[in-house]
Amino acid sequence: VLKNNQLIAHQVFFTFKDGIDWNSDLARKAEQTTKNHINEIEQIHGWYCGRSTVDRAQSVDFSLIGFFKSYSDLDEYMVHPDHQKGVLMWRNISTWKVSDILIDTDQLKLIVNTMSLVNEGK
């Protein structure tokens, strides 16, 4: 059971299979489907995803973090048809690792506020 000030942070880290890169239509379609989950799946409370910006041996190619208010929301997301569509797309082109952690919403607010100050040049 989550405390009132907690969210589940669902993190996924994708690594392309051999022969796949961002020049692949399959990769770009999987990316677009994943970016659109926030518009299709109401259980998602927050959603951030994108390509890796550096090329290092230990880097992944794409990652996401989704925020959920409850384990039942996370469970509903997992079986949602739009999520399953994305799973099938990524399965064809990548392997991935998942981590679900609890995050304190006060900590999240502090991170967002700090980012706002940086963006304002303070």
Task: Enumerate the language-model features and the residues they cover.
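Short S/T/G/P-rich N-terminal loop/turn motif that feeds into the first structured element of a domain
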Residues: 1-61, 69-76, 99-122
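Histidine-centered active-site/metal-ligand motif
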Residues: 10, 80-83
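Structural motif
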Residues: 42-45, 81, 94
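Conserved catalytic core of Hanks-type protein kinase domains
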Residues: 67-68, 92
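Residues that scaffold the ATP/ADP-binding catalytic core of kinase and kinase-like folds
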Residues: 77, 86
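Conserved short beta-strand edge segments in small beta-sheet-based binding/regulatory domains
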Residues: 87-102
